[in-house]
């Protein structure tokens, strides 16, 4: 039986009305949907769980091109940590993303590149992309890069980043992309951990109207990177003050001019690594997550096609960077595997104004838009006046990624961006999952604002009691979200540390993959992601989800964002401390009155036991580059350990920390 607390959480979810897909969505579909209705989805899902060989085998042959057919669809277990898919098969990721489309339709747009300054924007066709990828691959091959090697990529979100990744994959090597915003120290750590033989970068980056000396950061990092032998430098700004290190650094344009526009791709085994990607530092030391080639490619293609309802005529705009998994899977691999154009955006949603996203959608008639709630909150704060200037009628599917989208942001997204005419896909997944785990299929699964809905094909989701470790059967329940069997795009290991992989994902609940997140499953079987399991506070025996308390706080129209942490309390075990940032125009609000109002809001929404001990009003919350709130920072400050914050240089807004320390000190009488 669920506890009263669990029942209350799920009861709140059950009260949300189902939203059917608007008729305009179907009117805008260029072809019939891939799945007719939710019943067909459920039938396909059941087959994917009960007969994964019979389900995924034919799909792998349909969506991917093979140099040598596979003989075994699925092998290994979660418990043993030896998952493998499509054994015996051979293929190449670059061929699947580029060549086959270039041969069939060379003039079709592949990369629609929107630069920070719109005047620098351009389009690469599939034919162009094949030539550019082959030339860069030729350079790398001449440097001795081969199957089994790893090459680092430290580039902004531009065409060259995509070309570099595909060129590395063309040779059967693995790419390790580092977000072009990390410090020299972070670059060094990632390059050394992956033993990268080469690095691909640029002179400078342009983002939000600002210029960043990318090459300088790389030079600082490479002082302590003994494995890097060569560096390829793209001239983004052509700044004459950027200098090369003789014998190590070479300019992109000079070197690629030496090689022909076609280089045959290298076949690799299905389980050979395609890439490494380091998880963000919000959970401690970054882990180099390793994704295999065939399984990852199938996951990317399958989820892009079915969850977003992608057709050959569509144009996907994923507002995510290739420095993160969203950019890998849904800006690069997913759309290119399906042969559709992908919009690559170098800039920010606020430059030159808050209408930039919508200007891009209108200009290219994008059919799909995929973005993080962090950006949506920023745009909502700026107001709707920038949205109404643009024609967004080409849009059919709106996606959300990176964190659960709160019902109020969902409603705003639906009304002002989608005009109540689009399907919204609130997607739940992870760097480690490679592709979507839980999401409502566009045009198929009705929505519940705030819920990620049903698991995707092959994802046998389960809720685990965190105390007993036993699976919770049935609906109307809450627990730790786990997965009962492996799926094609699941990460295979942590680079050079399989023990860490097992301890992190497989050993907490043997026989299950541990997501690290809590979730509720309502009476319809819809999943509601409740945030990280470690983002739970225990007040007087009540286990409270911080995400639930945060949702209650942002119901107040004055609050833009909220983050909740637990601190030690002699009486209750833990106490709730809430940090809130206000919307523009509310900074002069009576802070004491607002604090009391917010405490009352939580008491009313959840119960007296969940009421924050203190509400601290701040200018901004500390975030990672991918937009996730760093609650670790807030916990340290709240525990009077501000002198033990560690490295905060990888935050997107490190200046926020000083304001948080000051606000906490002012309220608790400490400096």
From Swiss-Prot:
One Gene Ontology MF term: AMP binding
One Pfam family linked to the record: AMP-binding_C
Coiled coil: none
EC number of this enzyme: 6.2.1.1
Residue numbers binding ATP: 402-404, 426-431, 517, 532, 543
One example of a Gene Ontology biological process annotation: acetyl-CoA biosynthetic process from acetate
Residues annotated as binding CoA: 207-210, 326, 540, 603
SUPFAM superfamilies cross-referenced by the UniProt entry: Acetyl-CoA synthetase-like
Keywords, comma-separated and alphabetical: ATP-binding, Ligase, Nucleotide-binding
Record field: catalytic activity: acetate + ATP + CoA = acetyl-CoA + AMP + diphosphate
Gene Ontology CC annotations of this record: cytosol
InterPro entries: Ac_CoA_lig, ACAS_N, AMP-bd_C, AMP-bd_C_sf, AMP-binding_CS, AMP-dep_synth/lig_dom, ANL_N_sf
Family per record: Belongs to the ATP-dependent AMP-binding enzyme family.
Name by which UniProt lists this protein: Acetyl-coenzyme A synthetase 2
Species in which this protein is naturally found: Candida albicans (strain SC5314 / ATCC MYA-2876)
